[in-house]
């Protein structure tokens, strides 16, 4: 089973750390993205999710018509800082979907450093919002990426994988 690559609209950007000289960004997908891709690819009636171990684990199962049985993949999540139980369930679901291959290209993202001139920093904090402008994926690997600082309304990161 092959899931489509993530589009720029599927990917969210968050600030991982801030220094006086700039900030580091991370790319991620949310649970709604996974649900949408599962619905698109296998149909809304052909997949299911189950949580166990107090939401720490999630099992994502897809119906295999040829085998006439559910095929399952499972993973464990971690609590979020805001809503522990909901965050745990969401994280375990997203991780189980990574096991199916949804969004696995995010593991190949480059290091994203935004220098201080492209982000508003005050006391080693920023409230700037960022988004993926464009992404290019080849063979499940990110080969091109551009990021916009939505607050400043400008492109702040542009990267293309070097040809070998």
Spans of model-derived segments:
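Positively charged, aromatic-enriched nucleic acid-contacting surfaces
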Residues: 31-164
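N-terminal, Lys/Arg- and Ser/Thr-rich interaction peptides
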Residues: 1-24
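Short histidine-centered catalytic/ligand-binding loop motif
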Residues: 16-27, 76-83
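Flexible, active-site-adjacent loop/turn segments at secondary-structure boundaries
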Residues: 1-4, 26, 100, 104-105
């Amino acid at each position: 089973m092959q899931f489509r690559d993530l589009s720029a609209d599927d990917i969210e950007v968050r600030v991982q750390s801030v220094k006086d000289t700039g900030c580091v960004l991370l790319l991620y997908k949310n649970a709604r993205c996974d649900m949408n891709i599962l619905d698109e690819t296998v149909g809304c009636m052909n997949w299911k999710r189950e949580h166990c171990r107090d939401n720490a684990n999630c099992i994502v199962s897809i119906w295999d018509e040829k085998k006439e049985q559910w095929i399952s993949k499972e993973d464990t999540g971690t609590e979020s800082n805001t809503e522990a139980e909901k965050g745990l369930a969401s994280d375990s679901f997203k991780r189980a979907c990574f096991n199916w291959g949804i969004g696995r290209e995010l593991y190949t993202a480059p290091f994203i450093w935004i220098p201080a001139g492209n982000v508003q920093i005050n006391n080693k904090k920023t409230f700037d919002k960022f988004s993926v402008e464009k992404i290019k994926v080849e063979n499940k690997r990110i080969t091109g990426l551009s990021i916009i600082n939505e607050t400043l309304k400008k492109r702040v990161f542009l990267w293309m994988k070097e040809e070998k």
